[in-house]
């Protein structure tokens, strides 16, 4: 029985990156032997065991055979006669198919170290096409290692296109797709994930609402990049620079879905696109089973981002209505999230990347003024029942109005 460290831990060690999880491969052992040594079996489809002391995962060497559609359509064969190389052969990328024994010796039958040095994401074998999830995984690795200069090998991208053109992607469960999206949204370059999916044809299959934005023009005055799809990924990139909040990043990604519905005769203008996008966001979130909080913020940003951009032009009554509709009184963090997404939207345009966004501070101060209205004083003044809410609303409007009067600078409208 021989034990090897495999996968991401070996790869990240060679890249001098922090190691998060360690996965081990056991060659030449049976499930019975593992149980006798105190390991606890947790894998149902194939033998995976937890170490009796540190609870790290140890998997028996195995081979796989495709028997059905989807990432789960495999028959696994685990036995003591499966070799190290046979197990590594079934892995997705060469950089993930390197093993290290207990003495520190590296085993690299598919030249993964060479590809690490060349910053290349390359498939191990043509069996790559049997697992559609690998399209998403490679896109995620491209995003994760973008700053290190990694790129996808042309022949691997060709196989990803082959998968996208088949029915395999449709066999992926919503949970697995969202899991990959969620991981990518948490990385430093989530926009690269979607760029890769667009390049290989998977975006059209899995995210048709986002795919539909590419080729849709916008006014060049406000959008020198013109293409709405390009703008969308620029906004996502800016959101990633502004915050680690994955919900804000997702909201940035889908804030302009309604622009795909603008009548061709009205292009490049997009009147009411924020509201037009709401059903598209709901459908996307339902299909992928996006968490409710993430969905709700995305809907808020789509609905209100045009108002936020034009904050200096809004009447006090309109501003308070926005605060009411979004329930910022109970969820003030939502205002911060909305402003972050709108800042990303403003900066996600060619030449606007470093511009200030005074609308954010302006709305924050409006909210503080409105939120400082003393409800106790209203009750003490003798208001009762529905009168309390009416009086509170009027005093909030007055507070915002007084703040607006103090503001001397008024920026020109910047339509997004």
From Swiss-Prot:
Residues bound to Mg(2+): 21, 23
PROSITE patterns in the cross-refs: HD
Cofactor: Mg(2+); Ni(2+)
Binding positions for CTP per the UniProt entry: 8, 11, 91, 137, 140
Keyword flag DNA-binding: no
The EC number(s) this enzyme carries: 2.7.7.72, 3.1.3.-, 3.1.4.-
Catalysis: reaction(s): a tRNA precursor + 2 CTP + ATP = a tRNA with a 3' CCA end + 3 diphosphate; a tRNA with a 3' CCA end + 2 CTP + ATP = a tRNA with a 3' CCACCA end + 3 diphosphate
Source organism, top-level taxon: Bacteria
GO molecular function, one term: CCA tRNA nucleotidyltransferase activity
Co-factor binding details: Magnesium is required for nucleotidyltransferase activity.
Domain HD, residue spans: 228-329
Pfam families linked: HD (PF01966), PolyA_pol (PF01743), PolyA_pol_RNAbd (PF12627)
Record's keyword terms, sorted: ATP-binding, Hydrolase, Magnesium, Metal-binding, Multifunctional enzyme, Nickel, Nucleotide-binding, Nucleotidyltransferase, RNA repair, RNA-binding, Transferase, tRNA processing
Keyword Hydrolase belongs to the record: yes
Family: Belongs to the tRNA nucleotidyltransferase/poly(A) polymerase family. Bacterial CCA-adding enzyme type 1 subfamily.
Subunit structure: Monomer. Can also form homodimers and oligomers.
Cross-referenced HAMAP family: CCA_bact_type1 (MF_01261), CCA_bact_type2 (MF_01262)
Protein name: Multifunctional CCA protein
């Amino acid at each position: 029985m021989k034990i090897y460290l495999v996968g991401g831990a070996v790869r990240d060690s060679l890249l001098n990156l922090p190691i998060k999880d360690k996965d081990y491969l056991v060659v030449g052992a049976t499930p019975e032997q593992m149980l006798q040594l105190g390991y606890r079996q947790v894998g149902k489809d194939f033998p995976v065991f937890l170490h009796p002391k540190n609870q790290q995962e140890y998997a028996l060497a195995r081979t796989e055979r495709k028997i059905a559609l989807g990432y789960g359509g495999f028959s696994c064969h685990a036995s003591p006669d499966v070799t190290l190389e046979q197990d590594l052969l079934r892995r997705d990328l060469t950089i993930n198919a390197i093993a290290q024994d207990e003495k520190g010796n590296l085993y690299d039958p598919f030249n993964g170290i060479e590809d690490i040095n060349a910053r290349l994401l390359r498939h191990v074998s043509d069996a790559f096409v049997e697992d559609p999830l690998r399209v998403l995984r490679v896109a995620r690795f491209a995003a994760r290692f973008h700053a290190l200069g990694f790129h996808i090998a042309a022949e691997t991208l060709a196989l990803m296109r082959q998968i996208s053109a088949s029915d395999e992607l449709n066999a992926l469960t919503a949970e697995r797709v969202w899991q990959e999206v969620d991981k990518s949204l948490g990385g430093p370059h989530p926009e690269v994930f979607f760029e890769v999916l667009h390049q290989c044809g998977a975006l059209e299959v899995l995210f048709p609402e986002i795919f539909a934005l590419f080729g849709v023009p916008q006014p060049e005055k406000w959008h020198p990049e013109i293409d709405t799809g390009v703008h969308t990924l620029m906004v996502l990139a800016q959101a990633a620079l502004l915050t680690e909040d994955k919900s804000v990043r997702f909201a940035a990604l889908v804030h302009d879905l309604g622009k795909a519905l603008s009548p061709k005769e009205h292009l490049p203008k997009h009147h009411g696109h924020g509201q037009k996008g709401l059903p598209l966001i709901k459908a996307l979130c339902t299909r992928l089973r996006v968490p409710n909080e993430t969905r709700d913020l995305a809907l808020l940003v789509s609905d209100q981002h045009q108002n936020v951009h034009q904050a200096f032009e809004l009447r006090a009554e309109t501003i308070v209505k926005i605060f009411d509709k979004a329930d910022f009184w109970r969820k003030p963090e939502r205002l911060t999230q909305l402003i972050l997404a709108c800042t990303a939207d403003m900066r996600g345009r060619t030449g606007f990347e470093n511009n200030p966004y005074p609308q954010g501070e302006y709305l924050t101060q409006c909210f503080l003024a409105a939120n400082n209205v003393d409800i106790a004083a209203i009750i003490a003044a003798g208001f009762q029942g529905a009168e309390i809410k009416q009086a509170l609303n009027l005093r909030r409007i007055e507070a915002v109005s007084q703040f607006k009067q103090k503001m001397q600078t008024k920026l020109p409208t910047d339509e997004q």
